[in-house]
Amino acid sequence: MSDKVLPINEIYTCLQGEGKLMGVPHILIRVSGCRLRCQFADSFCDTPYSSWKPEKGKFTYKDVHEFFVKHPHITHTMITGGGPTLHKEMLIKLCEIAKKNYQHITIETEGSEFVSTMGDLISLSPKLSNSTPKPGTIMPYTGKVVTEADKKKHEKWRCNYEAMSQLIENHPDYQLKPVISNEEDLEEVKELQRILGVPNDKVYLMPEGLERSQLNERRRWLTELCTREGYNFTDRLHIIVYGDERGV
């Protein structure tokens, strides 16, 4: 198995923090690099080390295989980012290794690029207009000013409907997991559903926030909205338990 270092900056065990498998033990593989530059109402991207300032890779295919071997009691894997579908050949190979180790595979993606894989669940998190970066503000992780180029790049890729449709059609299961900042975001969610043909029971609305206080502010009205409109609600378990920490 190759010893080439891959654009993977984290591998660890955790409970899935979001979506239909929330609370299920997973092996998380985080891929570095993303086309988007998310900035929400109260927060930036929660993994800026994979997007705004992507770290270099640290792991090989051999490392990934050995991690599976060391954790045989965990049967679910999520491959996330960053944007894992940007690294097509690597993603296909990671899925092959995971399947050889009897894993259920979730691929978490913003949906900007299509790739057909052995993944079991596509966790599709298309970014609404509430994620568009604001030129002139400071990105805390990098200390740099957000530019018009950041905004232009983000807007170019945040809603690739063709790629999202192909991801849905070419995998056994999927969920749509948009980040919600305010009630007005619901109109964009409904438009996404209309374009992609997604029923309500496949949608998990998730409150924006990197701090417990931010989640608390949105949780009540969002759960009420989900009940009223017939959507699933998903919390952010890792933030509730650990706050904005890495490796959890």
Please name every model-derived segment.
Residues L21, E55-G57, N216:
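Short, solvent-exposed loop/turn segments at secondary-structure boundaries
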Residues G17-L21, G33:
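Short secondary-structure boundary/capping segments within folded domains
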Residues S2-K4:
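Short coil-to-beta-strand transition motifs
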Residues L6-T13, P25, L36, F40-I122:
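Conserved Radical SAM active-site core
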Residues H65, T85-V248:
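Conserved AdoMet/S-adenosylmethionine-binding subsite of the radical SAM
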